[in-house]
């Protein structure tokens, strides 16, 4: 596993805390009953292991059954052992949600102006604004606020305002020299006006100002329009991860 991939895997786990986490012979089991976040409710096979693989899979299946959760594995091409994905497929686990992780070395891109109307918010205020932008009650994002607050990451909750209207929101998170771009959202009626691109550029500049060396993000592999936007900003694919699930 390349060092970028391993470090990004560790960082993305840090960015989404779990209620309970267990290390098991190189695998990380995470449990968060009530949360829909798969990264917080899955096994990440990140480090070398020594035990027999089929027995380990059975152990994980029982652990998640005991927790009242489906068994999910979060995998990439470098997951260990190498045959794990094939073994899970043979057990009937479906492959879902392939997601591309993209990286931007900040020293390789020229600085750009931060968009007018871009602002870094207090986390509680951002939750309120983001909930309203998505048309959801604030309570629906309360669990998200708690996960963010408990994660070992420096957060930069941001919004973009145009003509006194919040048109886009997102959040940046710095972990060491890496700065992640998360949850960029623009309502359907306000899309195709460049707001998400403006917010992404402003977050990249926030990353630079914070002292980070790299910006990174995760995007649905099938989301061609979003991928093209990020590629124009200089992001390059590093690896893809996916889930194997019993459900």
Residue ranges and their predicted role:
Residues 80-95, 197, 221-240, 247:
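Conserved active-site alpha-helix within GNAT-family acetyltransferase domains
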Residues 1-9, 44, 99, 108-147, ...:
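Short amphipathic alpha-helix that is part of the acyltransferase structural core
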Residues 67-77, 207-218:
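Conserved GNAT acetyl-CoA-binding A-motif
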Residues 53-61, 183-188, 192-209, 228-232:
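Conserved acetyl-CoA-binding loop-helix of GNAT-fold acetyltransferases
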Residues 1-66, 80, 139-140:
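N-terminal charged segments
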Residues 21-25, 77, 83-94, 154-170, ...:
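Conserved beta-hairpin
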């Amino acid at each position: 596993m390349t060092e970028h991939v391993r470090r990004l895997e560790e960082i993305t786990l840090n960015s989404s805390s779990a209620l309970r986490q267990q290390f098991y012979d190189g695998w990380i089991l995470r449990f968060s009953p009530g949360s829909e976040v798969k990264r917080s409710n899955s096994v990440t096979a990140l480090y070398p292991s020594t035990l027999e693989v089929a027995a380990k899979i059975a152990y994980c299946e029982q652990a998640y059954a005991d927790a009242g959760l489906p068994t999910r594995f979060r995998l990439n091409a470098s997951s260990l052992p190498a045959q794990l994905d094939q073994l899970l497929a043979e057990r009937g686990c479906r492959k879902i949600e392939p997601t591309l992780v993209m990286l931007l070395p900040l020293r390789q891109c020229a600085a750009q102006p931060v968009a007018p109307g871009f602002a870094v918010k207090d986390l509680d205020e951002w939750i309120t604004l983001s909930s309203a932008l998505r048309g959801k009650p604030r309570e629906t994002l309360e669990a998200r606020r708690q996960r963010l607050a408990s994660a070992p990451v420096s957060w930069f909750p941001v919004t973009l305002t145009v003509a006194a209207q919040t048109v886009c929101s997102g959040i940046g998170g710095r972990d060491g020299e890496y700065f992640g771009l998360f949850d960029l959202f623009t309502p359907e009626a306000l899309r195709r006006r460049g707001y998400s691109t403006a917010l992404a550029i402003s977050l990249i500049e926030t990353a630079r100002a914070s002292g980070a060396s790299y910006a990174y993000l995760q995007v649905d592999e099938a989301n061609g329009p979003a991928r093209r936007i990020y590629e124009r900003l200089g992001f390059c694919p590093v690896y893809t991860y996916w889930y194997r699930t019993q459900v």
